[in-house]
Design a protein with these regions (language model features):
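Small-residue-rich hydrophobic transmembrane alpha-helices
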Residues: 54-114, 151-170, 278-341, 367, ...
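Interhelical loop/hinge segments that connect adjacent transmembrane helices in multipass membrane
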Residues: 1-22, 203, 212-256
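Residue-level recognition of transmembrane alpha-helices
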Residues: 24, 58-61, 105, 141-144, ...
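Membrane-interface helix-loop junctions in multi-pass transport and translocation proteins
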Residues: 178-212, 341, 356
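Short membrane-interface helical motifs at transmembrane helix boundaries
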Residues: 111-138, 142, 332-359
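Signature of the first transmembrane helix
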Residues: 18-79, 83, 247-267
């Protein structure tokens, strides 16, 4: 029990920038490794399967991102409510909130698996996926969504740990399973010649292992954030609080992802080479947003704990500090990605047409950045 307590972090006192950075850095590294799941899939199929397979994986990115961002929205809701009770020192409600979060998570796993599997081909047709990559894209998504339970359990479980200030253990699990994903990708593709199905199976196996490790921490601990499978129940009052925070965040993420699906439908019109090039650069570009997402998660926990402790002024100061820190980090990373786009794209493929398409996308991205700075 003593060991478990050392993993929590009280953010209601101490240097605000230092606390935010200490909390955000493990999150940032963890987000990088979580994003590597799909990125590594693209690198492996691009180098060892072919351009059409790379285009198939790339064309599914917007759909898989939509599911990830939607789950993250609900995770934010749970983190805010649990963090508020942690900051207030209300251990009874905190424990109840954890039980409600996990009970709702198991129900969501069933609902979302059924929804995404049934809507799989519809989403690909909606994006006007070309016939020569449709079959492989559909296969990849079916396998991915059959194992989406692992993703949801990990995200919600790590959200509970983040609420009490523990970002290290979710990071450890994610690093280990990301390395495992790379190894399984190579084994399934090079040794067993499973093609695009191999990288999909590798991804869901790794996600289930990270989910199992996170669930084991929550079930086996004796600390205030523990839960027992036999004691799970839904507290409708707490669930309403979680949904009031999490649902708007989830909907906002889905709207953004859905707009990207419209863009993808136009890109698909130009064929596999353009699809692969744009898809590869978009995977690289996503890393620009990781510091913002990580700092937002850190700020969410910081604000929740301080509001719970009735330190509203400190909560406001934390919000301002997180914005300033995010802008500085994003500026540096964006510059590096734009300058070295060609080198980064060559990690995915040696196809010059794909690389040229990706470089064109990076130049347009530079213009977008300049416009935003001027505005």
């Amino acid at each position: 029990m003593a060991q478990a307590k050392t993993m929590t972090k009280d953010m209601t006192q101490g240097s605000i920038p230092k606390l935010l950075l200490e909390f955000a850095l493990p999150l940032m590294v963890g987000n990088i490794f979580q994003m590597l799941y799909n990125t590594v899939d693209s690198i492996v199929v691009g180098n060892f399967v072919g351009t059409n397979a790379l285009a198939a994986v790339s064309s599914t990115t917007m759909v898989t991102n939509m599911s990830v961002f939607f789950f993250n929205g609900f995770s934010i809701g749970a983190t805010v409510i649990i963090g508020k009770y942690f900051g207030a020192g209300d251990h009874k409600k905190l424990h109840r909130a954890v039980e409600t979060t996990m009970a709702a998570t198991f129900l969501l796993c069933l609902l979302f698996t059924a929804f995404f599997l049934s809507a799989n081909d519809f989403m690909l047709r909606f994006m006007k996926t070309p016939p020569d990559v449709f079959g492989e894209a559909s296969l990849y998504l079916r396998i991915y969504f059959a194992g989406v339970t692992g993703l949801l359990l990990y995200n919600m479980g790590s959200g509970v740990l983040r609420a009490v200030g523990d970002t290290k253990r979710p990071l450890y699990f994610l690093v280990l399973t990301s390395v495992l994903n790379i190894i399984l990708d190579l084994i399934f593709v090079l040794q067993f010649h499973m093609g695009i199905a191999g990288v999909a199976y590798a991804t869901i196996l790794a996600q289930f292992i990270s989910a199992a490790a996170t669930m084991a921490v929550l079930i086996r601990t004796d600390d205030i954030y523990c839960f027992r499978l036999g004691d799970l129940c839904l507290d409708w009052g707490i669930l309403k609080e979680i949904f009031c925070v999490g649902l708007p965040a989830a909907i906002q993420s889905v709207i953004t992802s859905f707009s990207n699906i419209f863009v993808q439908s136009y890109i698909n019109f130009f064929g596999p080479t353009t699809m692969a090039g744009w898809g590869c650069y978009n995977k690289i570009d996503q890393f620009v947003m990781l510091p913002v997402q990580s700092m937002a998660m850190a700020s969410t926990t910081f604000v929740a704990q301080n509001v719970g402790a009735q330190k509203d002024k400190r909560a406001d100061e934390g919000t301002v500090s997180s914005i300033i820190l995010s802008l500085g980090i994003v500026g540096v990373i964006t510059t590096l990605l734009v300058l070295f786009a060609d080198t980064a794209l060559r990690l995915f493929t040696s196809d010059e047409g794909v690389i040229l398409s990706g470089v064109d996308r990076s130049e347009e991205h530079t213009s977008e950045l300049q416009s935003r700075v001027e505005i």
